[in-house]
Amino acid sequence: MENSLFKKSEKKVRRALRVRKVLRGSSLKPRLSVVKTNKHIYVQLIDDSIGKTLASVSTIAKSSKAAGLVKKNQGVAKALGVQIAEIGKSLQVDRVVFDRGPFKYHGIIAMVADGAREGGLQF
């Protein structure tokens, strides 16, 4: 008999795979991956053709801590979206594929997307 925590994590992995089997990032249009945990938010630009992370920002990065972006809330999520958009522009990236992972497009995930759009990324 399996326990409920194992089933919950198994369902989370399945949801993420269901989303990611359709999405593929390239060097011209990388994948914008958003992960949230109980304490932090992580945002990455990933080139799946070479399997490399092009840029990343999070609430645990030194630059975010210096800017006061340490709590996990919607305002911080929007600021992280703007930051990743600025980094993407410096890498000549203007179009991305949004990867929400196993999370609903709601709340913090939606605010990261809105911040990235405000920063100039298109998806």
Curated annotation (Swiss-Prot):
* A Pfam match: Ribosomal_L18p
An example GO biological process term is:
translation
Q: Name one GO molecular function term.
A: structural constituent of ribosome
Gene3D superfamilies in the record, alphabetically? 3.30.420.100
Out of the domains of life, which is the source?
Answer: Bacteria
* InterPro entries xref list: Ribosomal_uL18_bac-type (IPR004389), Ribosomal_uL18_bac/euk (IPR005484)
Q: Which GO terms describe its cellular component?
A: cytosolic large ribosomal subunit
Q: What keywords would UniProt list here?
A: Ribonucleoprotein, Ribosomal protein, RNA-binding, rRNA-binding
**Role:** This is one of the proteins that bind and probably mediate the attachment of the 5S RNA into the large ribosomal subunit, where it forms part of the central protuberance.
Similarity field: Belongs to the universal ribosomal protein uL18 family.
Q: What is annotated about its quaternary structure and interactions?
A: Part of the 50S ribosomal subunit; part of the 5S rRNA/L5/L18/L25 subcomplex. Contacts the 5S and 23S rRNAs.
The name of this protein is: Large ribosomal subunit protein uL18
